[in-house]
Regions:
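Divalent-metal coordination cores built from histidine and acidic residues
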Residues: 1-83
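Histidine/acidic residue-rich metal-binding segments in metalloenzymes
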Residues: 24-30, 59-179
């Protein structure tokens, strides 16, 4: 968050109680009265880093993918609002590298999509600079159809027409795609 959302690292370290490991622990740590409704989503970046450690920028193994899907499923069962993934070439980590998961294989995302389908809960939020790529469109369409869950695609300037076209097609099929 400190590099993607421009939140100073010191503010994160001082303002967030870091004594948690699981998503349920995290939700418990922030369970205090708020003046607004707050929903927490499972970020692909964090799950990938947790499962793969320093290898989080590499291709995931079958075991890595299974672990990411299991963690996502458990987080959804524990109260996560949904799952998010960034495939946007403007999201960098604090070292200047693209965030983990930017180049994740569609099969990895489909496995995580299966977790959403099994729970039948949650939303999917995607930001991608590759929506003109048929492979990218394929896994997004697959997740929308497999899960039946709402999918939000954040539109970057170079892919708007591709996203709108896909959304119109899938919405006509009764799916919930929102650019």
């Amino acid at each position: 968050m400190e590099s993607v959302e421009d939140i100073p690292g010191t503010a994160l370290h001082e303002g967030i109680p870091w004594g948690w490991e699981s998503f349920a622990d995290y939700l418990h740590s922030i369970d205090t009265p708020y003046v607004m409704d707050v929903g927490a989503q499972v970020p692909h970046v964090a799950v990938r880093h947790y499962v793969m450690g320093a290898r989080c920028y590499d291709d995931a193994t079958a075991d890595d993918i299974a672990a990411m899907a299991a963690i996502t499923k458990q987080a959804l069962q524990d109260g996560a609002l949904g799952f998010t993934t960034s495939r946007f070439y403007g999201h960098f980590d604090k070292h200047g590298a693209l965030v983990p998961g930017t180049h994740a294989d569609g099969e990895e995302l489909k496995a995580i999509g299966n977790a959403l389908a099994e729970v039948d809960h949650g939303t999917v939020e995607i930001i991608s600079d590759r929506m003109e790529d048929p492979d990218e469109q394929h896994w997004v369409e697959w997740i929308a159809k497999r899960t039946g869950r709402p999918v939000t695609i954040l539109v970057t300037s170079n892919i708007g027409a591709d996203v709108w076209g896909m959304a119109e097609k899938l919405n006509a099929q009764g799916l919930k795609i929102r650019p």
